[in-house]
Amino acid sequence: MEIKVGCCGFPVSKNKYFENLNLVEIQQTFYKLIDEEILKKWRKEAPSNFEFTIKAFQGLTHTTKSFTWKRSGLKENEIKKLEKYVGNLKVNKITLEFWEKMLKYAKILNSKIILLQLPSSFNDNKENVEQTKEFLKNVETKEIKVVLELRGWKLENKRKIFEEFNVIDVVDINIDIPTKVENILYTRLHGKYEKYRIIYNYEYTQKELLNIKNKLIKLNAKENYVLFNNSYMFKNALEFLKIL
């Protein structure tokens, strides 16, 4: 089994990051449709064995009610025009164009994984199960692997999606296990959980890092993507590498 370790975003300079880690989940692609030249530059700067995964644009996953749209670079009237068409895996001309853009980003970066991270407001219900299925039926996925994060969903409803479609169930393995484990496991480690709240400002202990390692060994996926998303992500990622 192979364990790849990285962070959700670049918490340090890219040069320092490239020197120490071989994986990153790009966050900029979530907030806005960024210039392709920037991605070409990153691919050129990174080592040949460095892997980028892409967090899909919020226009696919988040409605315009989300505060994250403030970072989209769009004016209020431009966001307002998108209100009826974006988020919650809606399928229409606009969102399909967004998806095509993500595929283009993946090609530039030589990425094989695109993450769809749904907000907690995307509730676990029949309507959203069907909406997720409808989206996955309509998007091109031949050259990439979709990893899907459905926060707070029951196993029963997640199975309706992950057993029908060839997509990966993204979880924080500190609190959950994937619906199914085959070739790829993708885990995002957010920090500490207090009831229904995530404390991102949290540093994992050596004991917790060892526990994560042991869970990965037990689940025994061929390729394991371990992405730290807490405030101490870079420090914890380096510490985790040392114990592998």
Go through each PLM region and give its residues:
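Residues lining hydrophobic/aromatic ligand-binding pockets adjacent to catalytic sites
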Residues: 1-244
